[in-house]
Design a protein with these regions (language model features):
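Metal/cofactor-centered catalytic core regions of large enzymes
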Residues: 1-179
Length: 179
């Protein structure tokens, strides 16, 4: 998740940041995900929503409030209906512990694990920032004019990684890093 200044110095452009992020394969997400916090979307609130994914694409949307705004954002362009980011943020982060919901993604994303539908960050793939859009897509990166973060982290979130040999490794236990 780092970047490089024109002078060649590495830096993390989101300060302060609590997240470790990457890009999922644009066509590799399946299942249902529930939002843990409301989403402020272009001045409108979306509450208590979930998204269903099939082969990476959002195929079903439900929200108790603001569903039409969520649907409109997902339909902005073809890439808006695919994920571009997966970010891990411990539940006990300073932003979460403040107890404040800012309704501003740049702050709220540091309070919770989150996903984003829309564009992926090219820096998530080695050399991605120097690839053509076609090569980025081949490398698994989603492209869109949109990038909308929504929070999924909860106090009971469990994440288990699987290594190449099939070994399961706890990554998150009870909302926080397992190590």
């Amino acid at each position: 998740g780092a970047d490089v200044t024109p002078a060649g110095l590495p830096f993390v452009p989101n300060m302060p940041t609590e997240e470790i992020f990457t890009a999922p394969r644009w066509d590799g997400v399946n299942g249902r995900v529930y939002a843990a916090l409301p989403l402020a979307l272009d001045g409108n609130l979306v509450r208590n929503f979930y998204l269903d994914f099939q082969n990476g694409k959002i195929v079903n949307v439900h929200a108790e409030e603001g569903e039409e705004f969520l649907r409109n954002s997902i339909q902005l362009d073809e890439g808006s209906s695919y994920l571009g980011e997966v970010a891990l943020v411990p539940y006990n982060s300073p932003i979460r512990n403040s107890g404040i919901l800012f309704f501003n993604t740049l702050f709220d994303e540091n309070a919770s694990c989150h996903l984003a539908f829309g564009s992926a960050y090219p820096t998530c793939v080695r050399g991605g920032e120097h690839m053509s859009e076609e090569k980025q897509k081949e490398a698994g990166l989603n492209q869109s004019a949109n990038h909308v973060d929504f929070m999924v982290g909860t106090s009971d979130l469990s994440i288990v990684g699987t290594t190449h040999d099939g070994t399961e490794v706890p990554v998150f236990v009870d909302g926080n890093f397992a190590f």
